[in-house]
């Protein structure tokens, strides 16, 4: 949610942000109109109620010949107060509905355009020349099946399309990767949290995921109304809902480990083979509560954390500055780290980090205590440190001619010193 005072004073900035996102500019006028109607209705209600109370005080001490008249006026005002209250409530509801539709204000530095209009910030690592090595690279599913590590057939049998089993050393590789991510986060002062994967509608709504991404989310309606999270960002944001935080000693930094669920609505025909686009996966997510003036520095820190982790798994990658039209409603700016996938001949997203400024905090009523005793909304930021999809890039970039997979040096200590995952015969 945005600050209504900012919208009133900087209407052009908010409209320009909506335009850059490709969203409704007229919605800003709707918000301002409903704000005016809300304030006028509230003023009328409060004036009528004050008048009602004033007359009520006079009734007790009024002469007998005036009491009947005052009582009649009180009854008439009581009806008006009730009507004004109803109008004020209705106006407030319309205002809130309009306000919650508005997306966060895009940072001026974010590129204009849509999904394909990102700006490449930098590229890191050398892309392998498999032709020079004398063999054609195998895709991650072929490799995973060959080492008895990915079982799509039985995953589909059990859960339906886009489900899978990770087995044996590939399952161990995922655990190693996630554990390595947690260790790195803790070394940088993050607190580990195993988070709920079911959340209340108020929390999901507060994080902004029910705006443009509602069709991606699994909802359990009966007998409870809850949502399955697509990232532990949701639970970590809701953890301090309706709280006043002490950020005097610096930001609060968490890393959440959770299973995640996504419907992948609209993904028909995309990445139907393997584990790039699936309904269930595991992820370590960083989440930060910071002072407003510290959010940009924290965003840089999260991006640096992601790069440190990518260096450990030794895959070529690039960083892109996501265009405004491709941002989620909560994000003011977002950077993606995309790894090179040899068999696809292109970069694929592995991580993203977003600065949500005060947008989520206003919706979830999360504030910080100021030195003067007052409060103000905090900034929230998030960034992925490791997830199941990373296995795709690791396996394909570290494959050997015989179908084995070399384990990145930094991960070997997490896999009992194992250096290579060898092909295995099994009933796939």
From Swiss-Prot:
InterPro entries: aa-tRNA-synt_IIb, aa-tRNA-synth_II, aa-tRNA-synth_II/BPL/LPL, Ser-tRNA-ligase_type_1, Ser-tRNA-synth_1_N, SerRS_1_N_sf, tRNA-bd_arm. GO terms for molecular function: ATP binding; serine-tRNA ligase activity. SUPFAM superfamilies: Class II aaRS and biotin synthetases, tRNA-binding arm. The keyword Nucleotide-binding applies. Pathway: Aminoacyl-tRNA biosynthesis; selenocysteinyl-tRNA(Sec) biosynthesis; L-seryl-tRNA(Sec) from L-serine and tRNA(Sec): step 1/1. Consists of two distinct domains, a catalytic core and a N-terminal extension that is involved in tRNA binding. This is Serine--tRNA ligase.
